[in-house]
């Protein structure tokens, strides 16, 4: 740059103005402290021996040399799994086996969270993979004899993200000579596993015991001088699954920093069995590919006569030499090479069908294939498929087996072979959202939020979902309205404040679900609307730890 320009800029500066040095700064002397990695053994609070009941483990933290704590995580020991059958843990099994977390001081609850909300806040962190996201745990493994090892023992590490981690030492929880108790409530292990009919799940669940340890960072501080701080706690309201248009109401909303809305599927008994499951990799294409591979074994069969081992309601057509068949209004091409002269190719015309009325539209999976090309192997009596064109979708892969044979279906819906049915898998995942396996289908067509009687927000496009991803970096398909964007621990969080005189102390959410075809089984997945209100609290340290809900 020209020297004359530089000189003119420097000489024009008013030397009498007070300015901050941006090329160096005075280093301040911090409070003297020493961080420590602490591990704490817990004790079980379970009152009975029923393996299907929840189990609580508590950890007490009290030490005269510890002044503050944060960064909690737990380690969970998973035992060796042995026996016959197919078995896997769902991804992030460490988080998904947690039902509730609470940090208390005597009778005072300092902070608590539901397991699903904890998972949603942590799943995008790299450390979440340590909670049980790996091919070794999530891929389906098979045992062929009672002594076979299906899964090796391993240890999970689950980070319990809390408000006390927001700004390291500043946001830490100060003990002020109090005993702090961290209580983890676990689900039954049956709620987070995948297995087939051969696996002895009752024995596995009965023998399983949660073996866990709490780990945290503790600070030995010379003179801590704790000051009041603000923390946020989530409140969760779940609507009834039988309500077609739920209108959940959250009362006592005095200072709200955020509100979230999402939809969960509700599966009744025997509705959690599925035809296919991809395992570790669970993208949309993985689910679809796995579903197609399962269907093809029954869809195209090479045999010397009409295929056996199928229900009496199953129908087949013999594929002609040119490979072209017509299934009602759909043309399908089937080309299988190397078929012996004494055998024919058969196409299953009603593999999976669903309809609510006779002689009307029928949802037929067999009609979703347009061309199938492969080669038959006489040695293995199987077909190696090289190219398959189809319109199988993620919703098809997300239909529970029981829906095909439900009373709503006027047809015998599941006409697969007995061998194929024996491969079906029970998939228990308590944190599933939406009506399909990857939460792709946005089932909310309209959202309206009222504060008291006044509407404060309305949308027909998922704008709040996009802003949630933009502002929080979350990959969860969830709609969220955020009222606070202030830096943590520097300013009081901005809130939606109540006006009790005008009746503004409750949030009402009205939603409309999208229209789905009643002839598609996915239409009958029961839905639960979940609304989360994030309330603002103040934590005070005056010899004890006190938590106060902000009401102004």
Curated annotation (Swiss-Prot):
Any Pfam family from its record, for instance, is Pox_Rif
The annotated topology with respect to the bilayer is: Peripheral membrane protein
Q: Which GO terms describe its cellular component?
A: membrane
> What InterPro entries does UniProt report for this protein, alphabetically?
Poxvirus_Rif-R
Q: What does UniProt give as the signal peptide span?
A: none
Q: Where in the cell is it found?
A: Membrane
Q: Name one GO biological process term.
A: response to antibiotic
Name the UniProt key words of this record, in alphabetical order: Membrane
Describe the protein's quaternary organization and the partners it interacts with: Homotrimer. Self-assembles to form a layer. Interacts with A17 (via N-terminus); this interaction is necessary for D13 association with membranes.
Q: Which family does it belong to?
A: Belongs to the poxviridae protein D13 family.
**Chain's role:** Scaffold protein which forms a transitory spherical honeycomb lattice providing curvature and rigidity to the convex membrane of crescent and immature virions (IV). This association occurs concomitantly with viral membrane formation. Targeted by the drug rifampicin, which prevents the formation of this lattice, and hence virus morphogenesis. In the presence of rifampicin, irregularly shaped membranes that lack the honeycomb layer accumulate around areas of electron-dense viroplasm.
* Miscellaneous remark of the record: Displays structure similarities to capsid proteins.
The protein here is known as Scaffold protein
Q: Which organism is it from?
A: Fowlpox virus (strain NVSL)
> What are the top taxonomic ranks of the organism?
Viruses, Varidnaviria, Bamfordvirae, Nucleocytoviricota, Pokkesviricetes
């Amino acid at each position: 740059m020209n020297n004359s320009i530089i000189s003119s800029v420097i000489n024009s500066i008013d030397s009498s103005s007070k300015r901050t040095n941006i090329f160096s700064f005075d280093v301040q002397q911090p409070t003297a402290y020493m961080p420590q990695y602490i591990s704490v053994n817990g004790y079980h609070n379970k009152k009975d021996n029923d393996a299907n009941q929840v189990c609580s483990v508590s950890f007490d933290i009290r030490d005269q040399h510890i002044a503050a704590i944060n960064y909690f995580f737990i380690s969970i020991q998973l035992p060796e799994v042995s026996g016959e059958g197919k078995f896997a843990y769902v991804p992030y099994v460490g988080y998904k086996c947690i039902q509730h977390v609470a940090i208390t001081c005597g009778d005072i609850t300092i902070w608590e969270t539901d397991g699903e909300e904890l998972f949603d806040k942590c799943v995008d962190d790299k450390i979440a993979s340590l909670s049980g996201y790996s091919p070794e745990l999530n891929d389906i493994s098979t045992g062929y004899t009672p002594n076979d090892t299906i899964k090796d023992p391993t240890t999970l590490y689950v980070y319990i993200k809390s408000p006390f981690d927001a700004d390291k030492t500043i946001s830490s929880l100060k003990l002020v000579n109090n005993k702090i108790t961290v209580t983890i409530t676990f689900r039954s292990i049956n709620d987070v596993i995948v297995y087939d009919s051969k696996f002895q799940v009752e024995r596995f669940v009965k023998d399983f015991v949660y073996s866990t340890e709490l780990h945290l960072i503790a600070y030995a501080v010379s003179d801590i001088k704790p000051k009041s701080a603000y923390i946020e706690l989530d409140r969760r309201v779940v609507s009834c699954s039988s309500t077609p248009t739920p209108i959940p109401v959250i009362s006592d909303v005095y200072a709200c920093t955020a509100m979230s809305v999402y939809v969960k599927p509700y599966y009744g008994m025997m509705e959690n069995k599925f035809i296919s499951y991809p395992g570790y990799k669970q993208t949309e294409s993985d689910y679809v590919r796995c579903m197609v591979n399962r269907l093809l074994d029954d869809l195209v069969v090479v045999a010397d006569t009409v295929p056996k081992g199928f229900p009496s309601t199953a129908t087949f057509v013999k594929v002609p030499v040119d490979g072209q068949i017509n299934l009602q209004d759909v043309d399908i091409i089937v080309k299988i090479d190397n078929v012996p002269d004494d055998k024919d190719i058969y196409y299953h015309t009603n593999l999976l069908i669903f309809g609510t009325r006779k002689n009307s539209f029928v949802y037929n999976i067999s009609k979703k294939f347009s061309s199938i090309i492969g080669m038959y192997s006489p040695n293995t009596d199987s077909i190696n498929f090289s190219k398959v064109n189809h319109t199988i979708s993620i919703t098809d892969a997300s239909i529970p087996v029981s829906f095909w044979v439900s009373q709503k279906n006027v047809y015998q819906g599941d006409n697969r072979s007995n061998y194929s049915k024996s491969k079906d898998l029970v998939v228990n995942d308590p944190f599933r959202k939406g009506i399909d396996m990857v939460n792709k289908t946005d089932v909310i067509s309209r959202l309206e939020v009222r504060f008291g009687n006044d509407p404060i927000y309305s949308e027909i496009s998922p704008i709040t979902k996009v802003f949630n991803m933009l502002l929080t970096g979350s990959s969860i398909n969830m709609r969220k309205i955020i009222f606070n964007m202030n830096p943590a621990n520097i300013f009081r969080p901005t809130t939606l404040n109540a006006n009790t005189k005008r009746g503004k102390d409750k949030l009402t959410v009205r939603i409309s679900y999208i229209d789905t075809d009643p002839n598609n089984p996915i239409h009958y997945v029961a839905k639960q609307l979940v609304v989360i209100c994030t309330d603002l609290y103040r934590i005070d340290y005056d010899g004890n730890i006190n938590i106060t809900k902000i009401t102004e």
